[in-house]
């Protein structure tokens, strides 16, 4: 199983030189957030691998315009080939920006603990809790 994890800054190697061959053999792409919508949609042209994503704290525009061809797993457990992946986007609140995906520590804990399904992988936007 080959998983490509991407986050925050678009890879110049993928953005400028992406081909089907370059992504060949990758089974799943996980986006940890804060990537432009256009970048994620661009990658869908070069792979048949599912692209799962969570919201980053700078993805406020996603509230009105989600990336096409990708699967948002925020606050869900997504099962892929038996692997249970929990999406936990956003970050710990650091300002009052209402458009950002920010949560208090209590809210984050509740998001993780309220998920009754078991999970093996957390797809997360911030450093470990």
What is each of the regions a protein language model found here?
Residues 1-46, 117:
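N-terminal active-site segment of His-dependent metallophosphoesterases
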Residues 5-13, 55-129:
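Conserved catalytic scaffold of divalent metal-dependent phosphoesterases
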Residues 30, 52-54:
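A short beta-strand/loop micro-motif in the catalytic core of glycosyltransferases
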Residues 47-51:
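A short helix->loop->beta-strand "cap" motif at the edges of active sites that frequently abuts
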């Amino acid at each position: 199983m080959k998983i490509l994890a991407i986050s925050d800054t678009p890879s110049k190697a993928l953005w400028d030189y992406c081909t089907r061959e370059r992504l060949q053999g990758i089974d799943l792409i996980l986006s940890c957030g804060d990537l432009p919508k256009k970048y994620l949609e661009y990658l869908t042209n070069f792979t048949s691998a599912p692209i799962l994503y969570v919201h980053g704290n700078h993805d406020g525009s996603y509230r009105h315009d989600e990336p096409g061809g990708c699967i948002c797993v925020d606050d869900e457990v997504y099962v892929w080939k038996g692997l249970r992946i929990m999406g936990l986007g956003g970050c710990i609140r650091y300002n009052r920006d209402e458009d950002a995906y920010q949560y208090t520590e209590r809210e984050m804990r509740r998001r993780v603990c309220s998920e009754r399904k078991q999970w093996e992988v957390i797809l997360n936007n911030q450093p470990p809790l």
